[in-house]
């Protein structure tokens, strides 16, 4: 415990030193022209650097925001009062009072509530019992794990938690190691979420983009997200062929001999949260279907579909935040009514799920809020104009930009343990670089291909590290994908 306290103290001191260093630099050499200069990159560089060093995203983003406020105030000559105005009023308050941002947060909170309700209702348990009676052999167990992961594409946390708890007894029965179960779950959850237009990832990504329809941009990135498609194809091949290689083959050989853990003690085995015994398979499938249908209806409604606009145009021009929040709230009402009608959940249990669902989404809300505020600081300092000028002056750098972003995203997410925090930092920088091109989207109706490819690279890099990392906290995510322990929520929500 004492060691943990010292670790947090050292991180706090390091952050304060960065802020102090910034202040000293300003005092020593007053900044008069920070906008559009190298100084404009200072806030995101600090955020990324601190995240890599401390492996903690919240404080890193906040220190980056604070540094941006200090530089902006110094350049404007407004002093410390200007710093707090830039950070609090122009940053936090403005972003949290933005209708689009609030709509995204509402959708995430409602999604968290629905996740809790579906877990309590027992549909996952019922599916597990059905699968245990019908699945034969190792290939069947592995493919069933994959297909269930594809079905639950609305959220990677819900995906990991549900698939892990449902399929664990079945894969244990067929002597599939926990390591392979973790691989199957992790290699399906994030990849399927980043190519699903109705998901928490789609909402989060659209919330980091300004000046263009976020959902439309997200949909355009899907064909370019080769990482997701290749990973899914690899899972299908490994599951269907029952092929293993490298360290996984060692785990699987041990599992075939009865050792599914490849260890003498099962440190991470914990009891799952209690669920009702009255749940059926339909209690899992129907709520997911209702959520998808009503969210799509909500989005095309905001795009003018019911006023005569064709489906594709309505979906492309929808107000994603309003449509998703409208659809998810409608779905929540229907799901609660359905569960109460089926008598799988009581009214009090449904109401208790509201607070529990909100609590699950707090880390995601913090990451998005800080990412929005950091983007405000970089916009104030005109970082996009500076980076855009550098990129345009170096043609080779422009061509390699997607590769650079992919590598940076992998490194950042690997070190911090947060994929959401990674694209929350990088995507605003990308959109700032292409501000001029994005300004014409409303007239042309076409999003520049380089913007789409660069954002795809950010998403692919962020999602790749969910599977690669063996450093805390993400190592726990993979173990908990197989064991579905109660403490899994923290590591997964770091994303």
Segments (PLM) and residue ranges:
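Alpha-helical transmembrane segments and their helix-start/interface "positive-inside/aromatic belt" motifs
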Residues: 5-15, 44-62, 142, 179-187, ...
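Interfacial loop-to-helix junctions that mark the boundaries of transmembrane helices
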Residues: 9, 31-37, 90-102, 217-225, ...
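Hydrophobic mid-bilayer segments of alpha-helices in multi-pass membrane transport proteins
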Residues: 14-18, 38-80, 104-113, 228-233, ...
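Short, hydrophobic transmembrane alpha-helix segments
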Residues: 25-35, 53
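Transmembrane helix-bundle signature of multi-pass membrane transporters/permeases
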Residues: 65-66, 146-152, 166, 183-194, ...
């Amino acid at each position: 415990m004492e060691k943990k306290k010292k670790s947090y103290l050292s991180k706090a001191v390091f952050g304060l030193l960065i802020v102090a260093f910034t202040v000293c630099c300003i005092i020593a050499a007053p900044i008069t022209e920070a906008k559009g200069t190298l100084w404009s990159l200072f806030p995101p560089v600090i955020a990324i650097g601190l995240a890599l060093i401390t492996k903690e995203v919240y404080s890193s983003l906040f220190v980056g925001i604070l540094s941006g406020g200090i530089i902006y105030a110094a350049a404007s000559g407004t002093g410390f009062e200007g710093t707090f105005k830039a950070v609090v009023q122009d940053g936090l308050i403005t972003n949290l009072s933005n209708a689009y941002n609030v709509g995204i947060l509402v959708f995430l909170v409602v999604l968290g509530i629905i996740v809790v309700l579906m877990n309590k209702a027992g549909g996952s348990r019922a599916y597990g019992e059905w699968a245990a009676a019908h699945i034969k052999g190792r290939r069947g167990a592995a493919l069933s794990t994959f297909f269930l992961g594809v079905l639950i594409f609305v959220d990677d946390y819900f995906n990991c938690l549900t698939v892990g708890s449902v399929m664990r007894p079945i894969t244990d029965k067929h002597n599939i190691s926990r390591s392979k179960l973790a691989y199957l779950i992790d290699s399906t959850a994030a990849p399927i979420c980043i190519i699903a237009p109705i998901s928490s990832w789609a909402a989060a990504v659209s919330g980091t983009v300004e000046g263009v329809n976020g959902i439309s941009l997200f949909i355009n990135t899907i064909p370019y997200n080769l990482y997701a498609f290749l990973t899914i194809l690899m899972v299908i091949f490994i599951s269907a062929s029952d092929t293993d290689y490298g360290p996984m083959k060692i785990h699987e050989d041990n599992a075939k001999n009865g050792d599914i853990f490849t260890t003498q003690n099962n440190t991470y085995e914990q009891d799952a949260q209690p669920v009702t015994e009255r749940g059926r398979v339909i209690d899992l499938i129907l709520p997911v279907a209702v959520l998808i249908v009503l969210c799509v209806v909500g989005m095309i409604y905001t795009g003018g579909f019911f006023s005569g606009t064709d489906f594709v145009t309505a979906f492309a021009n929808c107000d994603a935040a309003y449509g998703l929040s409208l659809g998810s709230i409608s779905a929540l009402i229907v799901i609660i009514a359905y569960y109460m009608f089926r008598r799988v959940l009581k009214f009090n249990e449904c109401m208790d799920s509201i607070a529990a669902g909100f609590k699950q989404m707090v880390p995601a809300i913090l990451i998005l809020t800080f990412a929005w505020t950091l983007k405000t600081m970089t916009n104030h300092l005109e970082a996009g104009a500076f980076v855009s000028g550098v990129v345009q002056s170096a043609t080779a750098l422009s061509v390699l930009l997607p590769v650079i972003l992919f590598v940076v995203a992998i490194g950042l997410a690997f070190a911090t343990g947060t994929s959401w925090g990674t694209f929350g930092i990088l995507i605003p920088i990308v959109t700032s670089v292409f501000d001029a091109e994005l300004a014409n989207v409303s007239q042309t109706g076409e999003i520049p291909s380089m913007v789409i490819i660069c954002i795809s690279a950010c998403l692919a890099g962020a999602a790749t590290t969910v599977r690669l990392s063996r450093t805390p906290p993400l190592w726990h995510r993979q173990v908990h994908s197989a064991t579905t322990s109660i403490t899994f929520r923290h590591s997964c929500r770091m994303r």
